[in-house]
């Protein structure tokens, strides 16, 4: 079965993103296809490379990145929600005159079209 996940909670402070990541791992372990994860609203904070958890805490941002690198899962973040919350790639940082970007490698700024496409091409879309 082909799945897409929507994450609306931040990397830290709520259980949503952590539960979504565990669900993603379980899907892959059971042989399902996870085509994409779409980060929306507060979920865009999962793509902030400046997040720095304590050394004894789970690093969710880099774990999403590993999921992308190891399994080819697309990590799309809503561009409008990201810009509102200060998560930018190099292109947007330059366009906005910002000194630097903070989008973690492996994540892509995307429009809601990426979510619409996932909902049309996947058997299931699960929101956390």
Swiss-Prot record:
GO CC annotations on file? sulfurtransferase complex
| Pfam families with a match to the protein in the record | DsrE
- The catalytic residues are 78 (cysteine persulfide intermediate)
Into which EC class is this enzyme placed?
A: transferase
Instruction: Quote the InterPro entries the UniProt record gives.
Output: DsrEFH-like, Sulphur_relay_DsrE/F-like, Sulphur_relay_TusD/DsrE
Q: What one GO molecular function would you report for this record? A: sulfurtransferase activity
> Endoplasmic reticulum: present as a keyword of the record?
no
UniProt lists the family membership as follows: Belongs to the DsrE/TusD family.
- What broad class describes the main subcellular location of this protein? cytoplasm
- Source species: Escherichia coli O1:K1 / APEC
Purpose of the protein: Part of a sulfur-relay system required for 2-thiolation of 5-methylaminomethyl-2-thiouridine (mnm(5)s(2)U) at tRNA wobble positions. Accepts sulfur from TusA and transfers it in turn to TusE.
* Keywords (A to Z) from UniProt: Cytoplasm, Transferase, tRNA processing
Signal peptide (UniProt feature, chain positions): none
Asked whether the keyword Cytoplasm is assigned, the reply is yes
Q: Sorted alphabetically, which Gene3D superfamilies does this protein's record hold?
A: DsrEFH-like (3.40.1260.10)
The name of this protein is Sulfurtransferase TusD
> What biological-process GO terms show up in the record?
tRNA wobble position uridine thiolation
Enzyme Commission number(s) of this protein: 2.8.1.-
């Amino acid at each position: 079965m082909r799945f897409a996940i929507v994450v609306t909670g931040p990397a830290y402070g709520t259980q949503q993103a952590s539960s979504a990541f565990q669900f993603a791992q379980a899907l892959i372990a059971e042989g399902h296809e996870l085509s994409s994860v779409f980060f929306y609203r507060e979920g865009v904070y999962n793509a902030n490379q400046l997040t720095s958890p304590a050394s004894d805490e789970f690093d969710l941002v880099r774990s999403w990145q590993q999921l992308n690198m190891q399994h080819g899962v697309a990590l799309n973040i809503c561009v409008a929600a990201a810009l509102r919350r200060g998560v930018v790639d190099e292109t947007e940082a330059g366009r906005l005159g910002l000194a630097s970007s903070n989008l973690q490698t492996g994540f892509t700024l995307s429009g809601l079209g990426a979510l619409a496409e996932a909902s049309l091409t996947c058997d299931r879309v699960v929101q956390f």
